[in-house]
């Protein structure tokens, strides 16, 4: 889980906010953008990470990431079993959902987006099915205030709510005008094969309009005002991000995550097709939107997975599958034996266990898996040894703090070498396409590093040992090698 630089620099941002009592408004970490406007768009999540790190370090961050994920998938498992799936079948389906999401299990604020989108989709399903009152939609605006200040995935959540509620409003128009083929799409027939249709709950346009309006206003309830959603939109429109960051790249269908996502998509689409003739609900179509987004940017894959899981659980009792299982004598899917909803009391034991583990970590007690010091950064992936040499060099020559670095190493240096100033890191909204393009040029044409001058000229270079940059710097008369290991190499520019 500790293979993403965001885990580290997000924590440092939260530490600075907590220590100073002020939000960050300009870049404090790089020498290429120093003093330029930059907002900590995930400030609340970053502060939470800083507090956890203060008490339990990286162990605590991994623990609470696991807690968020465990809570999300336990919630989904509960919905599967309340739909009539018995635990063996629910476990198999849950494993598929986890497999389609696991490549993005990283201790970062985006995990909250996975959890909250799951809850929002479930709420929309419950409202449309009539299981809860439509007044529950008024819970969404305060939820989006919290979500907005934790992670930009709130934009996707609001888009989901907007699409569903607008479809509900549009559904009401043909119903008032009279029967039509469109009307039949928004009704469901009972699964028992009875004729006739049972309409979904009556739409309340005033309540929907109020909920939607407050959700949009909720996005502006943040310390940065309209600047925050503008940053989200700028990241969506970047043409370079898919080239430079794997999580923004299109889904590779033959990759492990691609196969898992497509397998889950096949299950979802097959169930949707089988249930379609019995009636259709708007919320059952939500995963289609996220599937398209996942194909365009792989980072959306977990969001497709959790919305698909919620929709599958909602569709199962209305599909032909219960009758098919009954005819075969199987009880793996039997809505009549659906599990009862559990109360908050069942969470007491897991909560106590989490508190116990966090207490062990906070106390610094060393023991396998749950103790302090168990989580370490992999020196075969991160420049652990090279950074030690870099810090020793900066202690002797602090004026050399401008470091050209591989983009992957930027967040690591921000966390582990705070006295250094990086050339780039993965805060792409700060560097914009122009800065990302310059980095790509230097990466692909290492000789151009000699053209950097003035405040843009690095004094040190920390690059991957198997990169073109390392090979160029090794042969350049302008640079001298200070350290090399299989992971990273450190160079210093020779005096003019």
Task: Please describe what each predicted stretch is.
Residues 40-50, 230-263:
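Juxtamembrane membrane-water interface segments that cap and precede transmembrane helices
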Residues 63-83:
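Transmembrane-helix motifs of polytopic, lipid-linked glycan transferases
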Residues 76-99, 114:
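Transmembrane-helix signature of polytopic, membrane-embedded enzymes
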Residues 97-101, 136-152, 214-219, 288-294:
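Membrane-interface alpha helices of multi-pass inner-membrane proteins
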Residues 120-136, 202, 268-275:
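Membrane-interface transmembrane helices that cradle and orient dolichyl/undecaprenyl
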Residues 126-145, 206-210, 284-287:
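Short hydrophobic alpha-helices at membrane interfaces in multi-pass membrane enzymes
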Residues 325-395, 408-410, 428, 440, ...:
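Membrane-proximal, lumen/periplasm-facing interface regions of secretory-pathway glyco-
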Residues 392-433, 454, 458-465, 491:
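Short periplasmic/luminal acceptor-recognition loop of GT-C membrane glycosyltransferases, typified by
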